[in-house]
């Protein structure tokens, strides 16, 4: 009998003081041509671009190749719509240029030490694709697979992945579902659920890269960041977590008082900044899954766009 073992999510709210200016819609609001995302993978799996929108004028484009968020359009302080995530203009780019832009990562986001897991005394060797570790489910993780898409209405869709027992040597037949839902107040609610018929490991996430200025040529290091966390999980030189927790007090990782990402992001005298080539770590949130507590907040002073994140 299958058992549900995961149900978690994150809500990202993008805030602006202005309503979007009206414009003539030809392609998507982000200028994407949906035909550039239409293809067949593995001879039988159709891929396309899906568009979600809400009454406030927000638009999110998603491809079922990797369950990826391709664009997020929200109004800036002047009412001009801006795309605040990195993405490609065609499905061919996602297939030919290795990246995790916007992807629904699985089976296991981040690294598994030396690619080894132990289940009920059995040692299982997983693919080693990053400094001898298993990163993001291996070289053929879900971010490079085709999800089954179902758009429920203008603002909500589900993406389902069926991963067989032994997929990348992970145990268990797993069915995982990602739900993207836009709310009236410009939040993206991302919910993850999964079932398995065998003891296994799973750790899903979304891998979007945000630049709230709306211009990828502008460095995001001027963004003002708040993170509700008192510690991080430090890493070694292979970027594997050590199993410890490190207090952020009096370190570059302390964002309990909002501050710009620069100059601390390039403080390479700090060993953890050096190992991560900047901020690329896990913050241990104080929120403990409480959706009423803010986990993080990011603001672009250029665009006036703010991203608020909660986790549950």
Predicted segments, located by residue:
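An exposed, glycine/acidic-rich loop-and-rim segment of catalytic or binding clefts
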Residues: 19-58, 64-312
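Bacterial Sec-dependent N-terminal signal peptides
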Residues: 1-29
């Amino acid at each position: 009998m299958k058992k549900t073992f995961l149900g978690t999510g994150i809500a990202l709210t993008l805030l602006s003081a202005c309503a979007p200016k009206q414009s003539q819609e030809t392609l998507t609001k982000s200028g994407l041509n949906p035909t550039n995302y239409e293809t067949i993978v593995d001879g039988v799996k159709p891929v396309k671009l899906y568009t979600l929108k809400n009454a406030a004028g927000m638009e999110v484009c998603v491809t079922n190749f990797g369950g990826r968020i391709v664009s997020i359009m929200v109004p800036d302080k002047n009412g001009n719509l801006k795309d605040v995530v990195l993405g490609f203009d065609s499905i061919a780019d996602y297939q030919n240029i290795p990246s995790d832009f916007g992807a629904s990562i699985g089976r296991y986001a981040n690294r598994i030490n030396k690619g080894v897991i132990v289940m009920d005394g059995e040692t299982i060797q997983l693919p080693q694709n990053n400094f001898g570790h298993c990163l993001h489910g291996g070289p053929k993780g879900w971010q490079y697979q085709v999800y089954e898409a179902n758009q429920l209405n203008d603002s909500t869709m589900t993406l389902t992945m069926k991963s067989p027992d032994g997929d990348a040597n992970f145990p268990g037949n797993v069915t995982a579902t990602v739900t993207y839902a836009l709310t009236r107040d410009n939040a993206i609610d991302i919910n993850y659920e999964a079932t398995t018929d065998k003891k296994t490991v799973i750790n899903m996430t979304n891998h979007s890269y945000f630049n709230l200025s709306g211009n990828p040529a502008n460095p995001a290091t001027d963004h003002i960041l708040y993170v509700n966390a008192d510690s991080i999980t430090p890493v070694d030189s292979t970027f594997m977590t050590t199993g410890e927790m490190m207090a952020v007090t009096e370190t570059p990782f302390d964002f309990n008082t909002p501050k710009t990402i620069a100059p601390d992001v390039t403080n390479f005298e700090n060993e953890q900044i050096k190992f991560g080539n900047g901020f690329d770590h896990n913050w241990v949130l104080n929120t403990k899954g409480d959706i009423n507590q803010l986990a993080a907040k990011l603001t672009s002073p250029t665009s006036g766009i703010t991203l608020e994140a909660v986790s549950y």
